[in-house]
């Protein structure tokens, strides 16, 4: 049994030889959540957007290798993003975002989860190391309240120039944004939930009252406050303490 640390006052994990895992919370904290912050790539959607962009130049394998190392915490996120974005230089950006909106696949259970959270008057946001056009698209599609992500630089011929513009949304920035949103809405961070799959999501998981690693990379699962390895992100509602009947009422 791994007992709670100071950063994990209400949750911990139990792993047994038969590979069963429990998520344990204090009863008083389960249904009091007021803020949800999600990662985008491999969390709200199945894909990694930067790899979809890389496919336009047939370099997705090269980009995917760097992405995997970054998500495992083997590379500094800012450095890995710069390396990957540089590889995208020259790709025509005139129609890429409209095309990608048709290609992205929303993760199973996400629409239902967001609908339920909206009924519960919970503030929702996406804080992504990906890119703002698709984060904004998902914000509108899912009824989120906030969207933060990176911006790709574009040259005079409307092609990607291999750079990003503005502050990088890395692990530190995600945690900062969560705290900023909580402060704006007068929400105690202990009433916030952070959901992601990569190493750059860990910091926001730890500043939130409850952090969930969703089908995360193995190294991330070892460090995360709690892990959820199921086929539907809406299973978070069970962790929050809702039963089948209550969930049906929230989703219908």
PLM regions: where:
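Alpha-helical substrate-recognition element adjacent to the catalytic core
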Residues: 1-8, 13-152, 231
């Amino acid at each position: 049994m791994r007992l709670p640390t100071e950063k994990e006052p209400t949750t911990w994990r139990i792993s047994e030889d038969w590979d069963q895992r429990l998520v344990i919370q204090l009863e008083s904290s389960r249904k009091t959540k007021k803020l949800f912050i999600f990662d985008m790539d491999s969390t709200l959607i199945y894909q990694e957007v930067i790899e979809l962009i890389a496919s336009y130049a047939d370099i997705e394998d090269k980009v995917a290798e760097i992405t995997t190392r970054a998500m495992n915490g083997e590379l500094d996120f800012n450095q890995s993003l710069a390396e990957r974005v540089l590889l995208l230089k020259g790709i025509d950006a005139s129609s890429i975002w409209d095309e990608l909106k048709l290609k992205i696949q929303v993760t199973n259970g996400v629409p239902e989860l967001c609908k339920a959270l909206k009924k519960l008057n919970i503030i929702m946001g996406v804080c992504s190391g990906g890119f703002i056009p698709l984060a904004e698209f998902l914000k509108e599609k899912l009824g989120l309240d906030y969207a933060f992500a990176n911006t790709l630089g574009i040259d005079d011929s409307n092609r990607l120039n291999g750079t990003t513009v503005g502050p990088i949304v890395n692990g530190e920035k995600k945690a900062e944004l969560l705290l900023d949103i909580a402060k704006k809405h007068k929400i105690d961070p202990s009433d916030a939930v952070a959901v992601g799959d990569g190493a750059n999501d860990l910091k926001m998981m730890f500043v939130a009252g409850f952090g969930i690693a969703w089908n995360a990379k193995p190294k991330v699962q070892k460090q995360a406050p709690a892990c959820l390895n199921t086929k539907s992100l809406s299973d978070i509602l069970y962790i929050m303490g809702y039963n089948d009947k209550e969930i049906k009422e929230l989703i219908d």
